Curated annotation (Swiss-Prot):
Reaction(s) this enzyme catalyzes, per UniProt: guanosine(46) in tRNA + S-adenosyl-L-methionine = N(7)-methylguanosine(46) in tRNA + S-adenosyl-L-homocysteine
Protein name (database record): tRNA (guanine-N(7)-)-methyltransferase
Gene source species: Mycolicibacterium vanbaalenii (strain DSM 7251 / JCM 13017 / BCRC 16820 / KCTC 9966 / NRRL B-24157 / PYR-1) (Mycobacterium vanbaalenii)
Gene3D superfamilies according to UniProt: Vaccinia Virus protein VP39 (3.40.50.150)
Taxonomy of the source species: Bacteria, Bacillati, Actinomycetota, Actinomycetes, Mycobacteriales
GO annotations of cellular component type: tRNA methyltransferase complex
Length: 266
């Protein structure tokens, strides 16, 4: 474990009316499959709702939901996200799957103003907190998608389109009977590898060592990815996460595994 509480897993041959707005996750209409997120209810404040109403039409998208306007999202290959039009510039794009309340998302975007970040989260409350922080801090290089990360990868991005994919502290689903719900499975990692451009980075972090071993095994088994060290120089995106509540746990003695791969082949 490093001075920052990071643990490197050795390469293996193994493993979202005012205060009562609902936060039910969107229905996964695209893929009738086991999902990695849990059902959850929460609310957003009046102030957050006001910010949402003002900014979401410009800065947010929804994969699909029973309440989504018809035609809001064209999911044909020709209708994938036009990130240059959305951000208003040509820049490398990083996709963060499961941004939570956006603490890392905001800080890393502020540190890399030349990188465009698309943050995906199922739960509206987390996106509302991030949207309010973006507004307060004047951060312009983040866009938000509410929905399932696998649906986003499948329908909204094409091959070789991403400079980075970040998956920080995904639900470990620790019980053996729930392991099938884990986000980072072979099929998902293969999809990520397809969407990364050559030289692009997959960066995963977890404080659950059982899941870390699983992620290591799955990532190392993907032939288009090569394990790299988080401190390697010359990477196209930063791998320095801010000190979040998860990092504070690490400094208190809970190890955090940082796992990175580079896409080496098309």
């Amino acid at each position: 474990m490093s001075d920052h509480g990071r643990m490197h897993i050795p390469e293996s041959g193994l493993a979202t009316p005012a205060a009562a707005h609902s936060d039910d996750p969107p229905h996964p209409h695209f893929n009738r499959r086991v999902t990695s997120f849990r059902a959850r209810r929460s609310t957003i404040s009046d102030a957050q709702q006001a910010t949402w109403d003002r900014l979401w039409p410009e800065l947010g998208r929804q994969v699909r939901d029973g309440d989504a306007p018809a035609g809001r999202l064209d999911t044909t290959p020709a209708g994938r996200l036009d990130t240059e039009a959305w951000f208003g510039r040509h820049a490398p794009v990083v996709l963060e799957i499961g941004c939570g309340t956006g603490t890392s998302t905001l800080a890393m975007a502020q540190a890399e103003p030349d990188i465009d970040v698309v943050a995906v989260e199922v739960y509206r409350r987390g996106l509302a907190q991030l949207l309010s922080a973006m507004d307060r801090e004047g951060v312009t290089n983040i866009r938000l998608i509410r929905g399932d990360g696998v649906d986003v990868l499948t329908h909204m991005f094409g091959p070789d389109s991403l400079t980075g994919v970040r998956v920080f502290f995904p639900d470990p689903w620790p019980k053996a009977r729930h392991h099938k719900r884990r986000l980072l499975q072979p099929d998902t990692v293969a999809l990520i590898a397809d969407r990364l451009r050559p030289g692009g980075i997959l960066h995963a972090a977890t404080d659950h060592m059982g899941y870390a071993g699983h992620i290591a095994e799955v990532g190392d088994a993907e032939p288009r990815l090569r394990r790299i060290d988080p401190d390697d120089a010359g990477l196209p995106i930063s791998t320095a996460r801010p000190v979040t509540k998860y990092q504070r746990k690490a400094l208190a003695g809970t190890e955090v595994a940082e796992l990175l791969w580079e896409k080496t082949t098309p």
